[in-house]
Amino acid sequence: MERCSVAQQFEDRFHRKFYYLRLSVTDVCNFKCTYCLPDGYQPSGQKNSSFLNLSEIRRVVKAFADCGTSKVRITGGEPSLRKDFTDIIHTVASTQGIKRVATTTNGYRMEKHIGEWKEAGLNQINVSVDSLDPRMFHQITGENKFHQVMSGIDRAFEVGFEQVKVNVVLMKDLNHNELPAFLHWIKHRPIQLRFIELMQTGEMDTLFQQHHVSGVAIRNHLIANGWLLKVKAANDGPAQVFVHPDYQGEIGLIMPYEKDFCASCNRLRVSAKGKLHLCLFGDRGVELRDLMQQDDQEPDLIARIQSELQTKSVSHFLNEGQTGMTPHLASIGG
């Protein structure tokens, strides 16, 4: 099949173009993070073999690439729990048109495997580190793995990553007062530290009410102390990224409750079971897997995605209390 013309690039009725695919490859996670899976992963009764296989991944990524997608983030659950994770990276990275291959991980396998992931084609990595206090890290994640994760980040730099992105979910009374420690940590390290506001999902209403805190106070502190806002590239995510001449690291803020947060939306999501999600907080998933079984199904796969895109909402409407069907962030890859 010939590559889509620019006019056929994935675009919705609000003229938002989609350069970025978040592809979940598993729902399984070995951590028990308070804000995601506090009781740990609960199997649905289906075998892990029900997750997308390599051939299905190759076909769906090619369809997205043929319509303008240039960045793929491999997510979970914890994606590195897949035994074929390195093969998945290679499959995505080998797809014509894909320029950036990223993953989001809890970091527990990084120290041992980050070199082979990089060799397979991974060129961006995000690691979840919700506290620099090992005891608080344990409390939030349910796992005593802080030093293991830190060693994995160090190893990423050793094998040649120029920058590591670190995700921190902001939570009142848990980690919201750790900004000074985080700033000290990134002063001489090329880390983009990303503070993410706690988001309300179907199973987390009480947690949200107890621990949600806005990132506005952090933003005001940064601006008052000489941090400057960077200009976004087309396929960048929603983070407002700040830089400072005295710091090697950067600070990103992801604040989904901000006005116009969705105006620059550039990503679509495919779940580990092959459903298209137009929004993290959407009210349904659209079956794509039946059109991932043969190479010659690509025109139909693209047509279905294009058609569904025209139903994408202008906003997530979180401010109006609409949290959609997402029970927790692990279910469609965050």
Curated annotation (Swiss-Prot):
It comes from Vibrio vulnificus (strain YJ016). SUPFAM superfamilies: Radical SAM enzymes (SSF102114). It is an enzyme of class 4 (lyase). Belongs to the radical SAM superfamily. MoaA family. It comes from the Bacteria. It catalyses: GTP + AH2 + S-adenosyl-L-methionine = (8S)-3',8-cyclo-7,8-dihydroguanosine 5'-triphosphate + 5'-deoxyadenosine + L-methionine + A + H(+). S-adenosyl-L-methionine binds at residues 35, 77, 128, 199. One of its GO terms (biological process) is Mo-molybdopterin cofactor biosynthetic process. The keyword Aminoacyl-tRNA synthetase does not apply. This is GTP 3',8-cyclase. The keyword 4Fe-4S applies. [4Fe-4S] cluster 2 binds at residues 262, 265, 279. Residues 13-239 form the Radical SAM core domain. Keywords: 4Fe-4S, GTP-binding, Iron, Iron-sulfur, Lyase, Metal-binding, Molybdenum cofactor biosynthesis, Nucleotide-binding, S-adenosyl-L-methionine. [4Fe-4S] cluster 1 binds at residues 29, 33, 36.
